[in-house]
Each structure stands twice: as C-alpha cells, then as structure tokens.
Amino acid sequence: MLVTYRYKLRLRSGQYARMAQLCEMQRQLYNAALEERIGAWSRARHSVTRLDQQKSLTEIRQADPEGHGSLPVNMGRWTLKRVEDAMTGFFSRVKRGQKAGFPRFKGRHRWSSFGMLEVSGMQLRGQFLILKGMDRAIRLNMHRPLPADAKIKGATFTLHGRHWFVSLQVESTEIVAAEAPTGPAIGLDVGVEHLATWSDGAVDGHIPNVRPRSRREHELRCAQRALARCRRGSRRRAKVRERLARLHRAIGNARDTHLHQQAERLARSHKLIVIERLQVRNMVRSAAGTVAEPGTNVRAKSGLNRSILDASMAKFLQYLRYKAERAGSAVLEVRAAGTSQLCSGCGTKVPKSLSVRRHSCACGLELQRDVNAARVILLRGLPAEGVQPLGQPNVADHGVRAAGTLLAA
C-alpha cells in the first residue's frame, strides 16, 4: 500500500537559502519547458513530448555542471512531469467541453515546491535526509516513525509560509491492519449542522462540526482589509500577507486535525461504512444567476456555500476511504438522491425543506432529520453486501422481489 508521510524540515540557517535556490531553479525549468512546447506548436505545429524534454534536460545538465548538473536528475524530471500533467489536463478539459484553462507560466509566488520521482540522489538515515545538492544533511522532525519495511518511492518538498516540509511516498505492507474491525455496519450522512451523523439502525451518533474558519472570521476580515489598504510592493504589504497566510494555515491545520481524528475513529470501529456519493462542486455553485435572470436568496446561498466549504465534507470522506483501507474496513458509496426525503421505517417519501430538522412520517416514525438520512443510506448499502431481505422497506429504490426469488443489488 502506498501512503504519504509528511515531516517538517529542521533546517540550518544556510540551508534555507539553498532550498529557496533549488525551488527557483525548478520554477525556471518549468517555465522554459512550457515555453518550448508553446513555441514549437506556434512555429511549426510540432508537439514536444516529455521524452524530448528529458533528452534536452540531459544536455542542460552537461552544459551546466554547477547548476542543474549538481542536482539529482529525478528532480528535473519531476518538474517536466508537472508540465506534462498540466498539458494533459488542459486537453482533457477541452475534450470534455469544460473551461480549458491553458497552463500558464509560474511567477515567484505561484511556485513553492519541487520533488523527485525516484529516490536516487536521496537517502534517509534515521532522522536525517541526505539530498544531493545540499552541503549538509537535512534533519526531519520525525513525529512518527516510518514502517519497518517502508520503501520510499518519491519525495516532494513544499514551502508553507516560512517552513519547509517533505512528503515521502512510502510503500509498505505493515500499514494495513492484520484484523478488520468487528463493529456493526453504519450509514453516514454528512452535513453542515453536524459534520457527520451515523447510525447502525439501533445506535446513533454525531460528529461535531468545529467550523474553524467561522470561529476566526473576524480575524480574517481584519487581515484582508489591512492587506487591501497596503501599497503593492511595500514591506508592510509583505508583512500583512504573511500574517494572513499564517492565519489560513492555522485554520487549515485545525480543520485537518479534526478530520483525521474523526475519520480514524470511524475506520477503526466499524467493518462497513456506507456513505453518499456527493458532488460537492455542484453543492456550492453560486445562486447569483445572470443579469437577464438574476438568482434568488443569493446571500443565504452564499452563507451556506461558505459553511459547506468550511466543513470540508469531501476531504473528510477522502480521509475516511484511505483510513478504512488501512484499518481493514470497507467504505461503500450509494446514491445521494432522496436520502433526506425518504422514511427509513416504511420507505415513504416525506418532502421537507432544509429548515425542517425533524423527520415525522405517517407510519409513526419520528427521528432527527440527519439520523433518518443515515439509516436510509445504510439500508441502501446493505443490499450491495448481499441480497435484500424479504420484507425490508424499499428505501433503497430497488425492484421489489417476490417470495422465493433473489434480487441482486
């Protein structure tokens, strides 16, 4: 299994300048490679491939032994792969009819990382990382050890504010748990009031939404207003921008810590977790409309969009998937349509707006809205694990089977 371990670098005073120099060299290489592709196509309608540019990189390294020639060749190849990925993504978006977004040249403030596709030219010895091109070994803040059988497949160095971090791509068999969890299967409904609500049909629970951005909204607004008043290029603007960046990092760290902890707890406690197949990008679309057809309730929808993004539902489900794989449990996705409108007791559709927080059905079932949705999600996922039990309420929208026949999920 491939997993990424992220560590903070404890650099010496002279190593900060060298890391910045390496990052700048890779930025210039990226811009040169992109310019070569654009120029070759505009002049002769010739497509330059990644292999062509890797051959050119060999010539550059031979002509510049003190610069690119002193660095691991995989570092330059990592940068060329980023150019290839940018062009591939552009053509893919064009074919799908989406907004193309042609790759653009990277300025100093739009490039903050470099990496290596392979580990040749880099060694990890205890808490020290030996990197070709650095005069001294780099000390890592190893807050957690790597698995004993870990094989490093790649590395990415990233600058966040004033600090450098390294992300090591590791392959290991010790990461996956030997025994799967034995807890009951649950359905999981994510939302804004609670980050997630789960239910196994008998026991229910909530995961709180900590709302890290909302808690520091006043600080963010003050910093953004101060930045808007600064003159571009001034020292004061640089200081305010750094203050704003630190604030955003603190918010992101608080959010990620909460998401990691809650996803880990669920993955280690339940053998099956059934979730909705959400399209968060569609959920946070603007309601402003156009000049000809202006939208309605624009301010309310904008506030809801901020709350959805602050909760980071998609990131939480992403963490849950890979943590479940490590814990030996399973995550199953089901359709999200109608989960909050159907009754988990009888399968009847009970329409309700977002302001209605209680589910009340004519069959006599009364539940908190999110708990009912979690139970519907669970019932939709159980047939995929086997067959639909006879007499089970048809909340999963499957075809109704006759007695004595089997219905595949």
Residue ranges and their predicted role:
Residues 41-53, 95, 178-181, 229-236:
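Short, glycine- and charge-enriched coil/turn segments that flank and shape catalytic ligand pockets
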Residues 3-6, 13-17, 28, 147-151, ...:
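Positively charged, helix-rich recognition surfaces that bind polyanionic ligands
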Residues 51-158, 289, 306, 310:
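Acidic carboxylate diad motif detector
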Residues 34-41, 87-98, 172, 277, ...:
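Long, hydrophobic, amphipathic alpha-helical segments used as structural scaffolds
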Residues 26-29, 86, 90, 323:
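Conserved short hydrophobic interaction patches
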Residues 33, 79-90, 371-380:
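Stable alpha-helical structural segments in soluble proteins, enriched in small hydrophobic residues
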